[in-house]
């Protein structure tokens, strides 16, 4: 049985950051989770619970999301990567492996680039290289640009099939269940997250990421078309691509399928 999450709220650089750690065993390098835009840390719990119970997992709400405070001014990805490193110091972690989902995948790339000695392995799920990405359909991106789906759960459930694709197209209850777990902190935090990625790209330094990297993609992802994950796998030297028969949120909808792939990657020497 995996141990329950231990929640802590910590003060870092003027921010109140809500963290959750699922304790594990010392023979496995802990895994740090960077979540998607507007997504509170509880949304990754089903995925985390599918992983090996010996794997220690660290999750947190970025500033302006869930239980973390909303800063009065915007931030960028390098600043967030620094905040994550400071959080690891505070929680007494040295080296970790990192998984980044969607928006969090950009932050994961930044962290792996800026703190290579802290990041043992990198997992990028349903994400892209930023400003140079091949975008999804305008209607999908327009809906994504608004925090309404997090503030109004019924609207979130209504548009989920169009923006997440995959299993969300087939199972209406999935969208309702997902929407019920969302904990919104309001519009400003969401807009700060959008601003963090404005004009940002990793394309010119992806070749400098030396960590073993697993790129995970869904073949029916309306937000981040598959070609973007192929580009990441092409640009990152020590990477492998794994494509799943699902949409944008395969970590949640296909947790039992994805977890063994991730554990195999993390345990490879």
Segments the model singles out, each with a brief description of its role:
Residues 15-67:
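Conserved HGGG/HGGXW glycine-rich cap/lid loop of the alpha/beta-hydrolase fold
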Residues 100, 104, 108:
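Gly/Ala-rich beta-loop-alpha elbow adjacent to hydrolase catalytic centers
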Residues 247-259:
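Catalytic histidine-centered segment of alpha/beta-hydrolase-like enzymes
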Residues 220-224:
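Acidic catalytic loop of the alpha/beta-hydrolase fold
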Residues 209, 215-217:
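Short beta-strand/loop motif that positions the catalytic acidic residue
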Residues 59-99:
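Active-site loop/oxyanion-hole signature of alpha/beta-hydrolase fold enzymes
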Residues 109, 113, 119-149:
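Flexible "cap/lid" loop of the alpha/beta hydrolase fold
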